[in-house]
Swiss-Prot record:
Organism: Drosophila melanogaster
Catalytic activity: L-arginyl-[protein] + 2 S-adenosyl-L-methionine = N(omega),N(omega)-dimethyl-L-arginyl-[protein] + 2 S-adenosyl-L-homocysteine + 2 H(+)
Record PTM text: The dimethylated protein is the major form.
Complex and partners: Homodimer. Interacts with EcR.
Name recorded for this polypeptide: Probable histone-arginine methyltransferase CARMER
Keyword line: Chromatin regulator, Cytoplasm, Methylation, Methyltransferase, Nucleus, S-adenosyl-L-methionine, Transcription, Transcription regulation, Transferase
A biological process from GO: positive regulation of transcription by RNA polymerase II
Subcellular location, principal: cytoplasm
Region forming the signal peptide: none
Gene: Art4
Length: 530
């Protein structure tokens, strides 16, 4: 995590206890061991003075001891937890029991000792479980924050040109909403959105980040010389305190199928810091749902499950697990992209209003479905994608993950039915999608579909936490049977047309390239080099 400058850390801690598990560093600390508790005799544990690096951790605060002369080498690492024994000794010293060591820390100043005492007290007097902790398994949270603590993962998102450029355009295109305003960046990651807010004229940005990425965000802030504008605060928005209300909240809280990772609840929770009539970027999200037909995808998953249908695999009968194998494969949502022509009806749109919806509204999301079928075929399941809108004072900007829009790192998601249903053009397909939040920062997705006027129905429950990432980078193929004329003749007609243009071009001094294109006449450059 980021280590704030001592003066900044003191200011934040004194003003409003910005983070209950503050991140800071202390230089010039002399560390002694208690050699004899009866006589209170001390011996220096390390040669010379040390620097203490305190960093946020889900269990408390990690205390790293490094030499003042060589900070690249960690001498010792301790964990300050709620049950850590500690006590003040005079004005500049602090006694603390860490692991098997009974230590006395003598700080360079009274202010440093007071700040360290506050760090310890904040850990020892942790608030009751936050909303985030109540809804999230500890193992899931640990894995989640570890994942987003990697620079490579931040790079993956930042290099999503559609995502990053749309955010920048939405913010800079509505500079009136940011000029001289106080901004909160929720789940800031590398801090890229905070930088966009500063580019738009923000007076102050509080960048909240709970993963180790906070330390890299702080480095970027300092190297770009905007530390007077951006304050990186390590911690969860559900647990930290801000010194003031904000005018705008910015965040990128969308997951697969919009709701995965349950970051949207954190985004809505952040509204407690939003001033009346404040702005949220993005402002609302639309989840689109449509029935699709894709025999290739269905067969692919079905055939995988048939591995367990072997009765003599190296002499072992696997068939008893075939049913469970089938269930497991069809519980996986498919993350990839597709040609929208596989969709059999216009998509149903479910809206999430980030300005007004409550966190509780996202615990159980029930979406009624009614599709008027446009083409006869086999419905293999439902396809999902989302759009979000940035409603600004100057302009509205949309970020889309539709199969008709440029591809993003969210792709699209498809949920298969183990038992597909045949449906005809003109029929009505009704049903419901139920998204039930779980403590693994995801949802259990239940699909129920029924053809009106018949007894035909199909259903499935999927685990959004465990998707199958199918995207390979290959071009999206058109659905079978969509060609209305001979593709071969169409191609040769195009070549013939191109050839006619080439002939005309050659008469006008152009050069044919590979027989199908026009090149620039470079003979002049070859004969008369500069």
């Amino acid at each position: 995590m980021s280590s704030l400058r001592p003066e900044e850390a003191r200011k934040l801690a004194t003003a409003a206890s910005v983070s209950p598990l503050s991140n800071c560093q202390f230089c010039g600390v002399v560390i002694s061991s208690i050699a004899d508790e009866q006589k209170l005799e001390f011996t220096n544990k390390y040669k010379g003075s040390c620097t203490l690096l305190c960093s946020y951790d889900s269990q408390g605060v990690v205390l790293r001891v490094v030499s003042d002369d060589d900070r690249s080498h960690v001498l010792k690492e301790y964990m300050i937890a709620a049950d850590t024994d500690a006590a003040q000794m005079g004005r500049r010293s602090y006694a603390v029991s860490l692991d098997a060591d009974n230590l006395v820390l003598r700080f360079a100043s009274e202010q440093d000792q007071q700040l360290f005492r506050k760090v310890v007290e904040n850990v020892k007097h942790l608030r009751p479980k936050s909303v985030f902790s109540q809804r999230t398994e500890e193992s899931s949270a640990s894995q989640y924050f570890q994942f987003y603590g990697y620079l490579s993962q931040q790079q993956n998102m930042m290099q999503d040109y559609v995502r990053t450029s749309t955010y920048q355009r939405a913010i800079l295109g509505n500079a009136v909403d940011f000029q001289d305003k106080i901004v909160l960046d929720v789940g800031a990651g590398s801090g890229i959105l905070s930088f966009f807010a500063v580019q738009a004229g923000a007076a102050k940005v509080y960048a909240i980040e709970a993963s180790n990425m906070a330390q890299y965000a702080q480095q970027l802030v300092e190297s770009n010389n905007v530390q007077h504008k951006i304050s990186v605060i390590p911690g969860k928005i559900e647990e930290i305190e801000l010194p003031e209300k904000v005018d705008v909240i910015i965040s990128e809280p969308m997951g697969y199928m919009l709701y995965n990772e349950r970051m949207l609840e954190t985004y809505l929770h952040a509204r407690k810091w939003l001033k009346p009539q404040g702005k949220m970027y993005p402002t609302h999200g639309d989840l689109h749902i449509a029935p699709f037909s894709d025999e290739s995808l269905y067969s692919e998953q079905y055939n995988k499950a048939n591995f367990w249908y072997q009765s003599a695999f190296h002499g072992v009968d696997l068939t008893t697990l075939h049913k469970e194998g089938m269930k497991e494969y069809f519980r996986q949502p498919i993350v990839d992209t597709f040609d929208i022509r596989i969709c059999m009806a216009k998509s149903v749109r479910h809206v999430c209003d980030f300005l007004n919806d409550k966190e509780d509204d996202l615990h159980l999301i029930s979406i009624p479905l009614e599709f008027h079928i446009l083409q006869t075929g086999i419905c293999h399941g439902l396809a999902f994608w989302f759009d979000v809108e940035f409603s600004g004072s100057s302009q509205n900007v949309w970020l889309s993950t539709s199969p008709t829009a440029p591809l993003t790192h969210w792709y699209q998601v498809r949920c298969l039915l183990p038992m597909p249903i045949f449906i005809k053009q003109g029929q009505t397909l009704t049903g419901r999608v139920l998204l039930e939040a779980n403590r693994r920062q995801s949802y259990d997705v239940t699909i129920d579909l029924h053809i009106e006027g018949t007894l035909i129905s199909s259903s499935n429950t999927l685990d959004l936490k465990n998707p199958y990432f199918r995207y390979t980078g290959a071009p999206v193929q058109a659905p079978p049977g969509t060609s209305t004329q001979s593709p071969s003749e169409q191609y040769w007609t195009q070549v013939d047309t191109q050839g006619s243009r080439n002939s005309s071009s050659m008469l006008n001094g152009g050069i044919s390239v590979n027989g199908i294109g026009e090149g620039m006449d470079i003979t002049h450059g070859l004969m008369h080099p500069h």
